[in-house]
Amino acid sequence: MNKAEAVAGYQTEQMLYMNKPYELSAFSYNAWVDPPADMLFPLFVQSLQASGYFFAVASSPTAESTDYRLDSQLLELHQNFLHNPSVIELKVKVVLTQVTANQVIASAVIKEHVPCPNNTPYGGVVAANKSTELMTKAVTRFVIHHIPPAG
């Protein structure tokens, strides 16, 4: 699995929100400990490994002898105040490649929208944690669905 990337605007530790259509803003006093794409990467690796479907899940782009590679790109992660209650909108693009043939097997854009328990940055964090849990499960299901069992 390659390290997750993020589209422009989401390559930051800033916690982003939307209160006007098509306009992202950042909370002044709140931030993620790392860019969200960097935080998603180990969670995807852990989820794939915990599935028990794979003998090993390599977390290095230079890993030798891998059959498949999963690339991911964070497309959106923000708290949307255009809804009440506000919602966390998380969107990730995943691309699964068969390495030896250098052929894309499948790709998808996976979206999670989770209501925030309250309209504060902390409420966004709670919802972001839930959306991340749902996203890691969805990515794992996507990969397992597209890779035949070893045998």
What are these regions (language model features)?
Residues S51-A101, P117:
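Surface-exposed short loop/turn segments
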Residues M1, F44, S72, V92-V94, ...:
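Buried hydrophobic packing residues in well-ordered domains
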Residues M1-A37, H145-G151:
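A structural "domain/chain start" motif
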Residues A4, Q73-L77, K111-H113:
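Generic short beta-strand segments
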Residues L24-A31, T100-R141:
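Short secondary-structure boundary motifs at beta->alpha junctions and helix caps
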Residues A50-V57, R141-G151:
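Surface-exposed helix-capping loop/turn segments at secondary-structure junctions
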Residues A37, F41-V45, S51, N129-T132, ...:
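Extracytoplasmic/secreted envelope proteins and their assembly/folding machinery
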